[in-house]
């Protein structure tokens, strides 16, 4: 079961209502925000297909997920997600073990919201900019839609 990272690339202007609702449900409410979801969630594939023209997504690796959690993970109060907080509140040894359990499917990141973890990540625009158009699909030489493991390079550029 892959763990998908979904990043909103396009902004909020002229978004059709059905796409806006789906982006809201995915917790992608502004540009350059990211969320992570398991493939096992019912309806996720259909939701990703619906918002394909506004987002990019792919399978995230464990090492990239750990770095994303370390640099951009937040808890309530806009405080950083730290190893100490994970040990005290989740009973895990640190962010490395949290990333491992998320990738394996034992934990779901969006369900950690009950414990005080924010279910999204605020990212920077990519360093060096996008190399191609944000109006075309990745398979057609653009930046949108499914990009497989190439999502890891984009996330590292946006941290």
From Swiss-Prot:
Protein name: Large ribosomal subunit protein uL30
Keywords, in A-Z order: Ribonucleoprotein, Ribosomal protein
Species whose genome carries this gene: Aeropyrum pernix (strain ATCC 700893 / DSM 11879 / JCM 9820 / NBRC 100138 / K1)
Any one GO CC term of the record: cytosolic large ribosomal subunit
Subunit and interaction comment: Part of the 50S ribosomal subunit.
SUPFAM superfamilies (UniProt xref): Ribosomal protein L30p/L7e (SSF55129)
Gene Ontology biological process terms, A to Z: maturation of LSU-rRNA from tricistronic rRNA transcript (SSU-rRNA, 5.8S rRNA, LSU-rRNA); translation
GO molecular function: RNA binding; structural constituent of ribosome
Keyword Hydrolase (UniProt): no
Pfam families, per database record: Ribosomal_L30
Family as reported in the entry's similarity comment: Belongs to the universal ribosomal protein uL30 family.
Keyword Ribonucleoprotein belongs to the record: yes
């Amino acid at each position: 079961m892959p763990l998908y990272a979904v990043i909103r690339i396009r902004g909020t202007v002229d978004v059709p209502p059905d796409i806006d609702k789906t982006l809201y449900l995915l917790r992608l409410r502004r540009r350059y925000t990211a969320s992570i979801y398991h493939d096992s969630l019912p309806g996720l594939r259909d939701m990703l297909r619906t918002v394909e023209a506004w987002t990019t997504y792919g399978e995230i690796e464990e090492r990239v997920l750990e770095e994303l959690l370390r640099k951009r993970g937040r808890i309530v109060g806009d405080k950083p997600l730290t190893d100490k907080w994970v040990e005290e509140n989740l009973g895990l040894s640190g962010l490395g073990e949290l990333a491992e359990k998320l990738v394996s499917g034992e934990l779901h990141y969006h369900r950690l919201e009950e414990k005080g973890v924010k279910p999204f990540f605020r990212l920077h625009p990519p360093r060096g900019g996008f190399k191609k158009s944000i109006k075309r699909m990745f398979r057609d030489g653009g930046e949108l839609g499914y990009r497989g493991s190439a999502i890891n390079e984009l996330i590292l550029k946006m941290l």
